[in-house]
Swiss-Prot record:
SUPFAM superfamilies: ArfGap/RecO-like zinc finger (SSF57863), Nucleic acid-binding proteins (SSF50249). The gene is recO. This is DNA repair protein RecO. GO terms for biological process: DNA recombination; double-strand break repair. Involved in DNA repair and RecF pathway recombination. It comes from Salmonella schwarzengrund (strain CVM19633). PANTHER family: DNA REPAIR PROTEIN RECO. NCBIfam families: reco. Disulfide bonds: none annotated. It comes from the Bacteria.
Length: 242
């Protein structure tokens, strides 16, 4: 890919005394693995640019699994994430690194990622709504289509007061039993609208995305999720009534 394209660094690690191995998410090529030669040297002007959450323009070349970074420029300063929003950003970076195949184009997902990072940088409240919206967008781009508005058993529209059980790859079915795999019709409508007006709907959204992402993540836990759990205060979510 000789042309310039927009990108973000998801993760980097030392590759040699002077080079970095980068996992980047690009607009045109999706996730790409790059070697940034000389990026660790004291004279390199890339060192400050090749950081997570910094909007980049870059060019690379190569035919193998690992490409060679040719040029990179920071479009702007890194989006200002700190504290809980920084952990949230690290979480979505790790999520993309775990679920996306290399060199598969996800142009719309790239903009969902950018919107999520910008929302995290601009929030003064809980990062949870932005995270849930991004997870739902990611599931959609992965082909995980779910009908939140109709009962999979009867075909009727969901009722706010009824309870529905989620069955993987099948949808939501009316249920008389309430447990961790069930959701109210109100929850499902909130998921469909990507709007979470209170703690209850936000928790329901988190339960659903955890369930839906599990097949993609396998049994290996996310490192960033554990860090997030340790950092997250017991109550960070503010409802519209607060």
């Amino acid at each position: 890919m000789e042309g310039w394209q927009r990108a973000f660094v998801l993760h980097s690690r030392p590759w040699s005394e002077t080079s970095l191995m980068l996992d980047v998410f690009t607009e045109e090529s999706g996730r790409v693995r790059l070697v940034a030669k000389g990026a660790r040297s004291k004279r390199s002007n890339l060192k400050g640019a090749l950081q997570p959450f910094t909007p980049l323009l870059l060019r690379y070349s190569g035919r193998g699994e690992v490409k060679t970074l040719r040029s990179a420029e920071a479009v702007s300063l890194a989006l200002p994430l700190s504290g809980i929003t920084l952990y949230s950003g690290l979480y979505i970076n790790e999520l993309l690194s775990r679920v996306l195949e290399y060199e598969t184009r996800f142009s719309e997902l790239f903009f969902d990622y950018l919107n999520c990072i910008q929302a995290l940088a601009g929030t003064t409240g809980s990062p949870e709504p932005a995270l849930r919206r991004f997870e739902l967008a990611l599931l959609g781009h992965l082909g995980y289509g779910v009908n939140f508005t109709h009962c999979a058993g009867s075909g009727e529209r969901v009722d706010d007061t009824m309870t529905y059980r989620y069955r993987e790859e099948k949808g939501f079915f009316a249920s008389v039993v309430i447990d961790n795999n069930t959701f109210t019709g109100r929850h499902l409508k909130a998921l469909d609208a990507r709007e979470f007006p209170d703690v209850d709907t936000l928790r329901a959204a988190k339960r659903f995305t955890r369930m839906a992402l599990k097949p993609y993540l396998g049994g290996k836990p996310l490192k960033s999720r554990e860090l997030f759990r340790q950092f997250m205060p017991k109550r960070t979510v503010k409802t519209k009534k607060d």
